Every structure is written in C-alpha cells, then in structure tokens.
Amino acid sequence: KLIFQFMGLKMEFLASKEFGYPGEQVPSELILTNPSKIPVSAISLKIYDKHYAGGDAAANEPIRVPIPLKLQVDQKLSQPYWLQKPVENALFQVGSQEKIGIPYELPKVGGFLSFTLGGEVFSLKVPLEYKFNDPVTGEIKEPFTVVPEVDLSLSKEVLFLVQGADATVSVTVNFRNTLLEGSLDFEGLTRDQYTIAGIEELPGQKQRIYKVIFLREDKETQKVVHARFTTVSGRVFDQTTQTISYPHIPSLTYFTPATLTLIQADWKVSGEKVGYLVGAGDEVPEVLSALGYDLRILGKDDFRLDFLNQFKAIVVGIRGFNTNEDLALHQSVLMDYVRAGGNLIVQYATSTPLVTKTLGPYPFLIGRNRVTVEGSPVQFDASHSLFSYPNVINQKDFEGWVQERGLYFATQIDARYQSPLMLQDPGEQSNKGGLITAKYGDGTYVYTGLSFFRQLPAGVPGAIKLFINLIEQ
C-alpha cells in the first residue's frame, strides 16, 4: 500500500449504482492511472474467484477495465458491525474487539488488485465504491451498499389498541427489482388478530402498500410483532432499510427488524382537542394523535383566549420556554386560559436561557436535579387526581421506563403548588420537583421534568397512562 501511494498510483473500483441486492448484476469498472515513469504491468483484479486482466499502465494513461460484477446470492448485507447482534441493556454487542472504534463497517464488496513492479508482484485490497457529481459540491464518493432485494416500512412503530384510537397501520413493501408475488403476515399474531383491508400498487413505483387493521382483545397486553413478506417461492423479507446521510461524512445504511409494538389497554381517553406548543422538538404530538386525541400544533396567531378555550389541554413541548419566543410574548394569555378552566402542561425546560422567567401562575425555579436510573424507586400520592383520574396509577406503571426518570426538576417551589410525586436515584436524596401542579382559577397547571419525550415514543405503557391523566384533569 505504501509503494502504491509513493508512486502516486490512482485506483478506483466504481459501481454504476450506490445500492445493490444479493444476486444482482452491478456493472462496474476498474480505473487505474500511473502518473510516474516507472512501468506497472500485469494489472488484474480478483473478485469472487474471478480474474479480470487490465494489462500494463503507461505513464499518465488510465486503464479502464469493465467488470461485469454479479453479487453473490448469499452476499451479506452492509449492516454496521455494532448492529449485527441485538442490543442488550442499551449496549451494542460486538463480537470482535478489533472492530471497536472503527467508525464504519468494512466494505462488504471489494476485490484484490495485483500488479507487477520491478519484477515483484504486489497485491492490494480495493473496495467497491459509487461516484457521482453533485452540481453544488462536485465529485462525491460513497460506499457501495448491499441491501435486501425487498424491504418493508411501517407507518407506525407503536400502535395503541385503545377505545377511540385508529387501529390501522400501512405496511409498504419496497422492491428493488420487479414486484414479487407473495403475502404479508405478522409473526407473533394469529390470522384472526388482524385484517388486511386493502392492497394498493402505485403505477410506476416498485411498491405494494398493505392497509392492516389490528383487532382489540379482551385483556391488556403489550407485544412486539414482526412484519414479514413471504414470496410464493418461500423467500422471507422482514427488515427495514434506513440511511443516515450528511454532507461531511460518508452515508451509512443500516437495517432493523420490521417490528410493531402493539399496546392493548383499557385506558380512558376522551379524544378531545389538545393544543401543542412546539419546543426544541419531540415526538409527543404523534403519540397523542395515535391515542385518539384531536391534536393541533399551535402557532403565533393562535394565542387568543376565545380560540384556546376550545382545547381540553395545551401541552408545551420540551424546552419550549427556552426556544419558543411566542411563549414569552403570550404567557399572560396562557395564564388566562388556565384561569378560565384550561389545563396547561409544561414539559421540562433548562434553567438558562429562558424566554421568560414566568413559567407558571406561581413562582418556582428550574433546577439541575435529575433522576438517571430509570428503574429507581418512586413514591406518589395515590389519592391525588393525577394518579387516580381517569386512570388509576400504580407502582407497576413505573416499570419499564427507558434511559431516565426525568431531568431539570422544579426547585424553590411556591407553597401553592402540590408535589404528589417523589423520585430519587439510589443513594441520593428524594426530590419532589419532578411533577408539580396547582389550581389556578378554574383550571390546572402542571410542570413536569419527567422524561415523557422519551417514554411516550418508546411505548412505555405506564408513562403514557400517566400523561393521559395529566391531559384529562
């Protein structure tokens, strides 16, 4: 490799496309340029036990060798090494210690370039890449990526089988080649637990879209089911394909099981209108919509009391009081909404910078306290309406939380607030600032540092149930 670089040899092994599936024909080309006066001879490329001769390279004359590459039928996908085994306890499982620290998976497709120099034969491993010209950036190279011939995408990751919620999921089967005949089913469910209500094929697109309706059961359950497409020949495809792409680093494609979490619960959800004031960004609105609430994202023109009064509750997204200037301009309107009987729920904010220091109807400050152990003990006032209406909260509802309990708890809390929840990390003092609430006029105000923005998208039932209670006050 050093000799190759010292001579200034330039080599490219380029595919005609960025993605290919096992068994696919991918026309490729080997391009080698020798800028030195030292002759390089007997150039060849070996890939999949086949040799492709390129001859000799004269000075500054590029050699171009067409490679009629056909990927092996059992070619492994370009899955990053840290995702090749299931995650355990939030840790990636890497079998080979030598790979740890490598930022990208080693290329799955490549060959061995051999050449003769001064009577000596040299060999160099070369990866297959894809090159294109961007009109703005110029020449860009990306790794050639092996993907499934067929993959799936689901319109939802979590589905709530609760009264009033939409129990429909769209499953899109994407074909890299021609559309294959086959059937869709769900591992973990029997055929009488769901109905395929419709199948659509869009003209000119290599997709087949299944509309699936899941049926409610008589008991509360939570299960993860696996969507899979089986061809008439018995081939099974059950993965999603996702690509991370930024201009300053190579693209990274990875594959995950096409799973859907089904949560069957007898939760009491009114399905009324809920307003959402966006903060730094979270996925709580999508979860509330999936639960059956009539959700509306509020903008700067919506801060009118006559308009806000239609909402059962208004929720402020995470760090809303750090990022949303409209909250500073219209905080008084929100307080009027609460006084008139509204329900305002403020998710965590950091202590600085705040767009306004007035977060609630009575004084409190944002501290830096947090509880990082997601399974840490919890104490709460079971008689308080937040934990008893309309759904009864018990200790089991605090099991299965992810990553943490909460952060940026309230401190220096005015006596007019109630603190019905006590949290603490092991070996630490208990903290009452994770959830505070107060009556103000005819309405209710809540500030919470609980990590609902993590728990709700993850489908943690107890956290979802508690958030429903916050809305339904």
Where are these regions (language model features)?
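Low-complexity, acidic Ser/Thr/Pro/Gly-rich terminal tails and inter-domain linkers that flank the onset
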Residues: 1-23, 131-162
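Short proline/glycine- and polar residue-rich coil/turn motifs
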Residues: 55-63, 199-208, 217
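Short beta-strand elements
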Residues: 120-153, 235-266
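Aromatic-Pro/Gly-enriched surface loop or interdomain linker
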Residues: 236-317, 350, 454
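Catalytic beta-strand/loop cores that center a nucleophilic Ser/Cys/Thr
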Residues: 368-460
